[in-house]
From Swiss-Prot:
This is Transaldolase 2. It comes from Streptomyces avermitilis (strain ATCC 31267 / DSM 46492 / JCM 5070 / NBRC 14893 / NCIMB 12804 / NRRL 8165 / MA-4680). Pathway: Carbohydrate degradation; pentose phosphate pathway; D-glyceraldehyde 3-phosphate and beta-D-fructose 6-phosphate from D-ribose 5-phosphate and D-xylulose 5-phosphate (non-oxidative stage): step 2/3. It is found in: Cytoplasm. The keyword Zinc does not apply. Belongs to the transaldolase family. Type 2 subfamily. Pfam families: TAL_FSA. Keywords: Cytoplasm, Pentose shunt, Schiff base, Transferase. PROSITE patterns: TRANSALDOLASE_1 (PS01054). Its EC number is 2.2.1.2. Coiled coil: none annotated.
Amino acid sequence: MTDALKRLSKEGVAIWLDDLSRKRITSGNLAELIDQQHVVGVTTNPSIFQKAISQGDGYDQQVSDLAARRVTVEEAIRMITTADVRDAADILRPVFDATDGQDGRVSIEVDPRLAHNTKATVAEAKQLAWLVDRPNTLIKIPATKAGIPAITEVIGLGISVNVTLIFSLERYRMVMDAYLAGLEKAKERGLDLSKIHSVASFFVSRVDTEIDKRIDALGTPEAKAARGKAGLANARLAYEAYEAVFSTDRWLALDKAQANKQRPLWASTGVKDPAYKDTMYVEELVAPNTVNTMPEATLEATADHGEIRGNTIAGTYEQARADLDAVEKLGIAYDDVVQLLEEEGVDKFEASWNDLLKSTEAELQRLAPSEG
């Protein structure tokens, strides 16, 4: 066991857990991770909830109660997931208070079937914020074309947001612009900007997985030399964009009004390829005012053998551009890759949501009271 997680925190990287389940809450495991592993936040998504509810037995009593009330399957899912998020938020509340609202956050995602519907996404975000009813909740909105204006509207209402499924630098700049526009709306409405927070979830390993697959298909030595570089390069250039946007006059005017910067959050940080070190997306993306949300396996690997070498983003931008250029020169189109990943990301979450509907419906039927 190393002190890597402690050192990571000291470098300004907030450690969040990319997982949540009823068992993790009731067993005391989440509280233990907060106390012992420097975890200061939690992210969830439809895939996480689908796995938790379909595999765990910690939900039987609540599902039985919901079945007795004859609620719809959609109502049941909302009741179950918001209960978990509410309980996790309560456990993290001391962290939230100690960090003035920056950390101690729990994220819950809007229905992924609404990813291409701005109006419905805004309505869903408002409903989720009301249902969870905790100040340390972040509502996750996907960075689709329809999601961008939804971000502005929801931030403008004073609701804190985790923008998810960001793969491209262009889309990330749109996300930051949407956040600033939302803050400007909130300011016009007289809202307290210091209470509004946001993170932008920039996905890392999926970029390498897709590009490496195309590199392997080429099979040349030049192609192989580019393996495992695009994901980090993309994320590092995202941090460069973050530094640029949050030093503009537009931002400084909001800063004077006590607004908070939208922190970059490194998502999809579990290493998929065994050829790479299992802590690569933690060790190589260390910079101030960032978040790294980790699956438990990555968290444990970092605690066990992580090597934190200080800031590993500063001074990398020129090399990062060269790494992405090398991929383009191989005939692998960056724009095609990131567009595909966004579409697949939405599709995966939607598939998980549909699986969640089916498994929850089956549980409602199994635990329904007998007639008579």
